[in-house]
Amino acid sequence: NQLVVKVPMKEISYNEDYPIVKLQVLPYMGASNVDEKGYMIVPEGTGGKINFNNGKTGQQRYQSDVYGWDYGQARTTIVDETKSNFPLLAIANETTQSSFLCVAEEGSSYATVQADISGKNNGYNYGTFIYSLIHGENMDVSTKSDTTVRVYEDGLPNETLSQRYIFSDKTDYSDLAKEYRGYLQKKYPSLGK
């Protein structure tokens, strides 16, 4: 009842003039349409719940950096943000009586969690991880000019991105929380002692 998707970054090729800045792995996995009932769990606090088709189309989509902002990056505006303390999202479809947890395992420090409801940009409720792979900054060409050039890191990190999907026929919030607890206990057995 699990699927593990791996993306070895050292095997990704790209034109150096057009670096791969962000990557989404299976972005619409488990997406549901406007006729389906259910919800998404996002890592807001101890687990926030976003109901499908909730009609809040005037609000921004949910987006949060896993483990918080990367302070190695320049910031030009003050942003009130929350950080995700755990690399998890879940989709529970009550219409089909199916659900899954998606855990960003390897490469989670590059991840941002994004979730949105139907009726804004498309007709789907979805949740996904977006990985920021190559960072860029605007650099001044010289002190005598106000021209800037976008400069990127030299290459992709030498890591493998890994997402684990844990499937279930349970759609109750507490059952999904227990499923995640079971995953953590299995992965980190010494923490339960």
Feature names for model-found ranges:
Residues N1-K193:
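Carbohydrate-recognition beta-sandwich/jelly-roll modules
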